[in-house]
Every structure is written in structure tokens, then in C-alpha cells.
């Protein structure tokens, strides 16, 4: 909805922010901030002279490989380049759209170094199931604009301003207890072979197969993808296949319908989000099944709210009204509902008269209605001031 001016999101931390370096870390910016110097907090632990909380969390990845033990599935790896470590975070999905995290190693880190030039800046899942760590391997990590006089002295005192050693380093971290996947060049595979890889246990293979299919724009894969969407028992394969169809421009009501009938909430959520991208005529073909849906999880509610608005029928608006009333305090649901009501705000408000107490939501409906003559319809290419 081009008239949406609200910005909603979930920005709570996933897991602890604490760090456990294995060397003293005075070479971080604002390390001089300490209670002993009259500040309210400490940047470094006064007893160990080590950083207390992350200050330079950089590139991260979620482990989706096959080499590490099973308990590693969906653990996040976060690089901390200022204090020479890579943090592991155990992620839990509550099912209500929020993630939580714990530190699986207690007061130890998954990977840490005493070499002050070790600057991990990114992490990747590898084709063989291992993890690749990108190490900038450089003395100075701070941008010149933010090098304080304190930090400058730290760099100079230990010769960290000296020449870099090569062009950085790549580390492959693997489990000796697990096997490594054999490498294959996915660019040389046929469409049927790539579609089969959408069910692969290694997330790198799934992602890359999807990308190659879309890059090729090979629409001959469409029937195979539709079969995976409709019949596969692998939820991840169904989701990848659906979004491959989207990338090929082959989304349709018939391809999305099996997703909406799935038992797995994540599959249904993908189906709802894909449905919101359909042309109006195709979306209307899904009206009956969408109206029968009830959110199996709290996470599903915003996606259902988003797709009900464009249906623009009394039954759809009645269902949307009930969702909004039940989720009156959930900004994600309210934002999704309003986003789907492009050029329909006033009609929806009239249909649901007197049922809403949330004044912010009502004011957004009024604003959208007043802006309707001037704004583009969602889905049209925007230009000029509309593109801002």
C-alpha cells in the first residue's frame, strides 16, 4: 500500500550480547568509558580488561549444513571483528513470530583467537557442509572517521598500523565426526536435477539450485516445481519450489492452493505471502480456501491479515475485522492489515464501523483514504515523488 507511513517491526535481540574473548581487548573504541572514569557503565570488564558486550558484530550466518552434529541445525554464527571471536547462538522459534537465543558454550566462545590481527568479518555455509570464516586479518578495523585519539594510541603502541599481511584469510571449519559433501558444479546440471536439489539437506544446495533455475529463466521447470509444491513431503522443498516459481514469473492460484492446505504452518505462511503477490483475478480464485483459514500460530496472523484486504469482499473484511480486533496490540498484524487495504481503506472502515478501538489504526485508514486519489495502486511502477 503506497499510502502506508507506519513502520513496524520486531527488533528485540536474539540471544545474549555478552562476549568472552580469550585475550585482553583494550583496542576497542570507547574502552575508556568506565565507572572509574566517572561514566555510568563499563565498556571493558574492570577485572579482566576484556570487552563485556559486542561492539562490532559483523557478517553472520545460520548453520544449514550437513557436516556438523545435528544439534547445530539453525545455530547462528556471528563474527565479532574487534575482539577476535566468532559467537554461536542457539536459536529457538517460539511459533509466535519471535525468536529467542541462548549461548550454548556458557562463558566460552565457539571460535576465538589471541592474535589481535584476527578480524573475522563474515561466515558462510559451504557446499560441502562445513563453514567458511572470512578473516580480514588486519591491524586496524575501525573506519578513519571514528578512530578516536584513544584508539589511535592503541593501534600505534602495538604496531597495528603496519602493513597488512596478505589479502586476508579464509578458514574452513569442519567437524571431524561428520562427512563432507562431494562438490558438484550446479551450473552444469539440468533443470530436473536442480529441482531435485531443492530437497537437499544442505541449505547451500537448495539456495543455489533455486538461484540457478531463476537465473536461467528456464520455464520448462514449471511442471516439476508445481509437482514439488503440491506433493513433496519436505516442507523446505515446497517453500523453495514455490519461490522458484515466483522468480520465474509462474506463480498462479493453482500452484499456491496446495500450500494453503498444508499442515505445516511455515508452508501455509509462504503460500499466503505468495498469494499477496498475485494479480487480482488469480487471488480471487483462492478466496474460498483463504476465508476458511484460521491462524495455526501467532506468526501466521499477519500474513493472513495481509492477503484478506485485497480480496475486498464482505466476507474477507469480516474475517479481517475479527483478526484486527483480536490482535489490537500487535503492530505487525495492524501494519499487515493496513498494507493490504490499498484504495479500500474507507470502504473497510465503513464495513467495520464501531469495532475498532485502536486510534492509530483508524487514523492510518483515514490517511490512506484521503491520499487515495493521489497515490499509485500497489503493484504499479512508481516514479517521481511516488518513488520516495
Tell what function each PLM region has.
Residues 1-193, 204, 212-214:
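Beta-propeller domains with acidic blade repeats across secreted/periplasmic ectodomains
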Residues 134-136, 157-167, 173-388:
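Long, ordered, helix-rich scaffold segments
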Amino acid at each position: 500500500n503506497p499510502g502506508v507511513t507506519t513502520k513496524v517491526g520486531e527488533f528485540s535481540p536474539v540471544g545474549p550480547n555478552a562476549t568472552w574473548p580469550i585475550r585482553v581487548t583494550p583496542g576497542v573504541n570507547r574502552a575508556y568509558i568506565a565507572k572509574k572514569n566517572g561514566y555510568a557503565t563499563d565498556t571493558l570488564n574492570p577485572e579482566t580488561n576484556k570487552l563485556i558486550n559486542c561492539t562490532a558484530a559483523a557478517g553472520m550466518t545460520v548453520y544449514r549444513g550437513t557436516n556438523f552434529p545435528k544439534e547445530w541445525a539453525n545455530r547462528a554464527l556471528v563474527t565479532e571483528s574487534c575482539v577476535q571471536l566468532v559467537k554461536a547462538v542457539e536459536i529457538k522459534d517460539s511459533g509466535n513470530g519471535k525468536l529467542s537465543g541462548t549461548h550454548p558454550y556458557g562463558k566460552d566462545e565457539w571460535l576465538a583467537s589471541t592474535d589481535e590481527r584476527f578480524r573475522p568479518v563474515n561466515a558462510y555455509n559451504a557446499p560441502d557442509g562445513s563453514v567458511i570464516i572470512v578473516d580480514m586479518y588486519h591491524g586496524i578495523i575501525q573506519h578513519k572517521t571514528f578512530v578516536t585519539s584513544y584508539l589511535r594510541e592503541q593501534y600505534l603502541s602495538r604496531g597495528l598500523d603496519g602493513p597488512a599481511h596478505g589479502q586476508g584469510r579464509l578458514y574452513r571449519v569442519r567437524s571431524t565426526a561428520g562427512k563432507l559433501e562431494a562438490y558438484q558444479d550446479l551450473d552444469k546440471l539440468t533443470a530436473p536435477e536442480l529441482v531435485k536439489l531443492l530437497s537437499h539437506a544442505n541449505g547451500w544446495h537448495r539456495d543455489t539450485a533455486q538461484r540457478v533455475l531463476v537465473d536461467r529463466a528456464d520455464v520448462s521447470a514449471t511442471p516439476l516445481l508445481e509437482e514439488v509444491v503440491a506433493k513433496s513431503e519436505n516442507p523446505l522443498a515446497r517453500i523453495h519450489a514455490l519461490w522458484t516459481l515466483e522468480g520465474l514469473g509462474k506463480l498462479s492460484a493453482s500452484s499456491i492452493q496446495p500450500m494453503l492446505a498444508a499442515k505445516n504452518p511455515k508452508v501455509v505462511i509462504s503460500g499466503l505471502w505468495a498469494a499477496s503477490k498475485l494479480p487480482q483475478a488469480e487471488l480471487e480464485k483462492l478466496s474460498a480456501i483463504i476465508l476458511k483459514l484460521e491462524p495455526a500460530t501467532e506468526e501466521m496472523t499477519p500474513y493472513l491479515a495481509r492477503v484478506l484486504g485485497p480480496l475486498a469482499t464482505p466476507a474477507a473484511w469480516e474475517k479481517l475485522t475479527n483478526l484486527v480486533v483480536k490482535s489490537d496490540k500487535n503492530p505487525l498484524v495492524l501494519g499487515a492489515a493496513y498494507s493490504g487495504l490499498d484504495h479500500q481503506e474507507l470502504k473497510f472502515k465503513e464495513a467495520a464501523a464501531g469495532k475498532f478501538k485502536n486510534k492509530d489504526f483508524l487514523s492510518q485508514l483515514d490517511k490512506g483514504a484521503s491520499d487515495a486519489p493521489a497515490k499509485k495502486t500497489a503493484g504499479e511502477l512508481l516514479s517521481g515523488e511516488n518513488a520516495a
